[in-house]
């Protein structure tokens, strides 16, 4: 650095000296012109000091610029490191869903649902209030026939109410948010498992109960779609412009099996999982075999899989899911796959020659063959039905034959005595048909501690309460004791419990314990069966791998079928 030639005044501040050095070294205009008057020299110096206080020197500015540049470089380096780390984490993560180039393919890795744990928690003494709320609701719900819209309203209102109670009572109140969410999922599954025969249209039809207009429409649409799928079961991949690959048949069969399992489960969540597994198997095929993913390729394969699977009651299943699955869960990936399946069903229902890659002559020939097969099947079913009726008519149960003549007079007398009361009771019972026809139902007491309004000594009271629950009443069909009502604004209406005979109470408790044990055993059985079926399906797709290896992969992927397929494809 070139120092100035004149002597520096030690009383001047460093910034002034630096500015003077700069002016002299760069041979700029002198700070003070000695030819000027003393006042002009003083003004020039004051102006310089004023400007110097407001503006930093060039050296300071350079130092600040260098510091800013260093900070930006350091920040940029940190950002690059973070981006690289996120990229590595993403690559190392077990991605068990299709890529993000499709709006419906993004999945949130939710915690594994443990229904068995929820049932164990519900049996604990601290959860007794929640169990009583549940028992009361189920008891009251099954005493009436509700319209579909009112069924949906009652169940959603109860689940909202009971979810608030789950957060208030142990063992969930002090648990983690994951345990609370698991309990809410478990409660929805438990409620809909118990009420399945009253909510699922084919189950109602099977019981012989007259159907409401909505349930009747479900059953009729099931029949139409089933006949369409049978009519077009001859369709091949080429007819839908699907490029056939070496391993496509294994993937399509596995996807069809997953979709067909939708009728094995009662909870909407479980039915959705069957649909998701079906769709994810298809996307695994596109990703790993075809090496290309798009909705244009996914939809034709889904249509082909539906035709191959031909699942029964598909329309009723979709309606059941939309009605009773929590609306907060019907979003994102689930809604995408659900709407895509509905589009595939609509395509099948309106399918004609122009929808396929096929000549009109071949199309008509295949349709004629299918119609002939369908007629032969119906004739065979009628013949088998007549044979079964004849066999039942000729068979006589020796036990019933011995006791029939001796008991006929007594049973007839009892029936005649009770007939007026039964006819009177029928006037107060309703069914959810558009014509509001009355539906006969027995009003015998159930002997439950939560059925106080249906005691033997209060027939009129029973009928009065019967009417109150049906229609537009805002009162929910559940009743709890005052001891468990913690909030007047959110709790159901409180009723005093009627005294119940100890023997009836013991029988009721035994029945509840037996039901709970059966539900636990059923949950364990389904879990074991799902694992065995998944291993069998994966062995069929990957015969080169040992069963132990497949099981290890399945366990590592927490039972997720599609991610297990991806892992095995990478290993092969």
Swiss-Prot record:
Q: Which UniProt keywords apply?
A: Ubl conjugation pathway
Q: Which Gene Ontology cellular component terms are annotated?
A: cytosol; endocytic vesicle
**What GO MF annotations does this protein's record show?**
guanyl-nucleotide exchange factor activity; small GTPase binding; ubiquitin binding
InterPro entries assigned: CUE (IPR003892), DUF5601 (IPR041545), UBA-like_sf (IPR009060), VPS9 (IPR003123), Vps9-like (IPR045046), VPS9_dom_sf (IPR037191)
Q: What happens when the gene is disrupted?
A: Results in mis-sorting and secretion of vacuolar carboxypeptidase Cpy1.
Residues in domain VPS9?
A: 219-357
Which domain of life does the UniProt lineage start with? Answer: Eukaryota
Is Phosphoprotein found in the keyword set?
Answer: no
- What Gene Ontology terms for biological process does this UniProt record contain? vesicle-mediated transport
Domain CUE positions: 529-571
Q: So what does this one do?
A: Required for vacuolar protein sorting; may be required for the consumption of transport vesicles containing vacuolar protein precursors. Required for vacuolar fusion.
Q: Name the chain's protein.
A: Vacuolar protein sorting-associated protein vps901
């Amino acid at each position: 650095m070139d120092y100035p030639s004149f002597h520096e005044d030690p009383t001047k501040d460093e910034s002034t000296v630096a500015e003077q050095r700069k002016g002299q070294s760069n041979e700029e205009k002198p700070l003070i012109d000695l030819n000027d008057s003393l006042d002009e020299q003083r003004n020039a110096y004051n102006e310089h000091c004023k400007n110097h206080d407001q503006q930093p020197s060039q050296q300071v500015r350079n130092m600040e610029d260098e510091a800013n540049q260093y900070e930006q470089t350091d920040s940029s380096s940190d950002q690059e490191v973070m981006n690289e780390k996120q990229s590595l984490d993403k690559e190392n993560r077990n991605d068990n869903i299709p890529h993000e180039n499709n709006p419906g393919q993004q999945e949130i890795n939710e915690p594994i649902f443990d229904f068995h744990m929820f049932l164990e928690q519900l049996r604990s003494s601290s959860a007794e209030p929640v169990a009583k709320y549940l028992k009361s609701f189920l008891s009251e719900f099954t005493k009436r026939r509700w319209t579909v819209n009112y069924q949906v309203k009652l169940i959603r209102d109860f689940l909202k109410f009971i979810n608030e109670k789950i957060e208030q009572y142990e063992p969930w109140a002090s648990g983690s948010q994951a345990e609370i969410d698991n309990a809410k999922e478990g409660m929805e599954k438990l409620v809909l498992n118990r009420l399945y025969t009253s909510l699922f249209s084919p189950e109602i039809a099977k019981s012989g109960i007259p159907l409401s207009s909505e349930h009747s429409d479900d059953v009729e649409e099931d029949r139409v779609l089933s006949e369409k799928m049978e009519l077009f079961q001859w369709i091949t991949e080429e007819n839908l412009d699907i490029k056939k690959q070496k391993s496509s048949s294994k993937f399509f069969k596995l996807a069809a099996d997953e979709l067909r399992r939708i009728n094995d489960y009662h909870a909407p969540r479980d039915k959705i999982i069957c649909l998701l597994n079906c769709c994810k198997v298809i996307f695994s095929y596109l990703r790993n075999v075809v090496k290309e993913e798009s909705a244009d390729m996914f939809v034709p394969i889904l249509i082909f899989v539906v035709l191959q699977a031909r699942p029964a009651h598909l329309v009723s299943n979709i309606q059941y899911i939309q009605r009773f699955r929590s609306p907060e869960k019907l979003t994102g990936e689930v809604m995408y796959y659900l709407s895509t399946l509905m589009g595939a069903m609509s395509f099948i229902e309106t399918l004609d020659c122009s929808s396929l890659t096929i000549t009109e002559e071949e199309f008509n020939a295949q349709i004629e063959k299918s119609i002939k097969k369908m007629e032969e099947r119906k004739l065979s079913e009628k013949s088998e039905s007549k044979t079964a009726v004849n066999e039942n008519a000729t068979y006589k149960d020796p036990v019933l034959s011995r006791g029939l003549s001796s008991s006929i007079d007594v049973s007839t007398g009892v029936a005649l005595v009770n007939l007026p009361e039964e006819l009177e009771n029928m006037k107060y019972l309703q069914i959810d048909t558009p014509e509001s026809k009355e539906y006969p139902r027995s009003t015998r007491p159930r002997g439950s501690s939560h059925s106080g309004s249906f005691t033997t000594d209060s027939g009129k009271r029973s009928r009065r309460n019967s009417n109150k629950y049906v229609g537009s009443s805002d009162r929910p069909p559940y009743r709890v004791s005052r001891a468990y009502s913690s909030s007047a604004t959110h709790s159901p209406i409180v009723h005093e419990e009627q005294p119940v005979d100890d023997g009836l109470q013991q029988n009721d408790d035994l029945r509840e314990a037996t039901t709970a044990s059966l539900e636990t055993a059923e949950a364990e059985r389904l879990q074991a069966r799902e694992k065995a079926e998944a291993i069998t399906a994966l062995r069929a797709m990957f015969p080169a791998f040992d069963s132990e290896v497949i099981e290890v992969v399945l366990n590592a992927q927490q039972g997720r079928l599609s991610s297990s397929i991806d892992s095995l494809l990478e290993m092969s």
